[in-house]
Amino acid sequence: IIDNQLAILGKNISNTYDKLENEKEDSKALVTDISHQLKTPLASLSMCNSILEDDELTLDEKHEFLAMSNKNISKLQNLIECLVNISRLEAAMIKLKPVKSSLKDTVIKAYNSAYIKAQNKNIDIILEILKDYQIVHDNKWTEEAIFNVIDNGIKYTELGGKIIITMEESLNFIKINIEDNGSGIDKKEFNNIFKRFYRGKEHEKKGIEGSGVGLYLTRKIFEDQGGSILVKSKIGSGSKFTLMLPK
């Protein structure tokens, strides 16, 4: 009996050690990623400020570099907000508060948050008739997660494009489909786009702004609620993201 108890105790200690080592590696990776993400906008901001010290600059040139500085400050603010959310989620400091409520209302709030940005690119966001499913979910964070996918669609859809949002019911899940007619995603990148700080080839090619955290946060928020996110896409034919939450 004592031998069995010692064996169990030894196994528990080993598992705890492995868990702590994994958490340590995750923390180191997060710090490295954060440092890398902050480096570019900080370098740009530093460069603009150095140039602004030049007394020979014209007023127009000063306005131009001030505008660039403000743009980089805005980027940093958005990035820091995303980084705070990621670190809090990964450290389990954010406690999701699921309650039984209308998923339709949550989707509409996410739609409203993205509406002006879509209008600025003349992109139609079409909300097809949504059934009012009452399911257990965290309203605030689920709205944030849905917004991230819509916002991603806006970034990769050309002027005058279209995004369609639908909802459907399967045996165990309620599905939210967000489909765009944008540039599409290479099949090889399907797994990578949900990784922390990953920015796809189209992102770099077209110079699309973004931190590479939106889809990662969405995946984390949905998985923490027993759900998931899937993507179907083809280069040049747009993308369809399906977000699922248990009924």
Model-derived segments and their meaning:
Residues A91-L96, Q134-D138:
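Conserved micro-motifs of the catalytic ATP-binding
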Residues K97-K100, Q119, D124-Q134, L171:
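Conserved catalytic submotifs in the C-terminal HATPase_c
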Residues G153-I154:
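Short helix-loop "hinge" at the ATP-lid/N-box region of the Bergerat-fold HATPase_c
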Residues G160-N172:
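Short beta-strand/loop element within the Bergerat-fold HATPase_c
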Residues D180:
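Acidic ATP/Mg2+-coordinating residue in the GHKL
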Residues I185-F197:
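Short conserved segment of the HATPase_c
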Residues G226-S228:
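Conserved glycine-rich
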